[in-house]
Amino acid sequence: RPLNLLISGASGVLGAALKPLLTTGGHQVWTLVRRRPDRSRGEIHWNPERDELNLAGLPPFDGVIHLAGDNIGEGRWTDAKKRRVIDSRVLGTGLLARTLAALPVRPAVLLSASAVGFYGNCLDCCMREEDPAGGDFISDVCSLWEHAATPAADAGIRTVFLRIGVVLSPRGGALQRLLATRA
């Protein structure tokens, strides 16, 4: 049956590939945007920095795919950049998790992005999902990021963390930059 889905980060490399795949599969896909939304395109405004997200009046979501977060591969890792990386993940995830938990009809699942960096920098280790977080900046970010989804899990929403590695696509991310150097 067609599903009613909500996606954050739909303009990123993964979201931009996922949304058309889901819509051509017959699913209704709503997207969270920070700019002025176009409701005819299924867009919903949100602003994690201001704790703004209103899902009232929308049909219940079967699932939510949360991919939003500042691109860690762009720019120098200044203190301000690190703060953006943390806030874009923790504030957005927390807002989304709290909002979903408060809905009268909650989604069955929240798929929330995280990163393989959760485990830290261990080049000669084979990691398992249940292994603890590492002890570096990215590990700390991932731990905070995943913890921010607690309200959704506590409300009975199945919460799954997608510990994503380097995204390889000619449409963006690391591979696009590598391919550009060959041109």
Question: What annotation goes with each model-predicted range?
Answer:
Residues 153-155, 160-161, 165-183:
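NAD(P)-dependent short-chain dehydrogenase/reductase
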Residues 12, 69-70, 116:
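Flexible cofactor-recognition loop at the NAD(P)H-binding site
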